[in-house]
Amino acid sequence: MVINYISPKKKEHKKTNSQILVKDYMTKNVITFFNYESIYLVMSTLHNNKISGAPVINKFGKLVGVISETDIMKHILESRYFNMPTSKNSVSNFMTKTVDTITPNKTIFDAASRFLDLNRKRFPVMSGDKILGIISRSDIITAALKIKGQNWRK
């Protein structure tokens, strides 16, 4: 299940060209995994790319979940307890199936609020069913560091 973020109307404010948007700070080249790939491949890819999670898609390219270090830690503990090898299990057995997303035209403040409200580390950035990128907590901090002056505008 994919949950797309649309901020409440009462909290929306008029957007100007000078506002700092998610699309300006998201990572555009997103590493994704197919839901049928092995958990071992996921562990290796996350480790080698120094990332903590990634979107999971089905064979049609539709977002169906997110796999994270936390999901993998649960798998490692279960596999040790039951003495089961890790390489034969697919991503779909361990991924988080309820995915919270955000749209590219939301501000970094909308994203920061959403990170705090939902306690997530990353959000796929979506336009309809298409993954445009991914934004993380560290991307929000990067954006905040680049803001000049006290008015929170570029």
Predicted segments with their positions:
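Tandem CBS (Cystathionine beta-synthase) repeat/Bateman regulatory domains
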Residues: 1-154
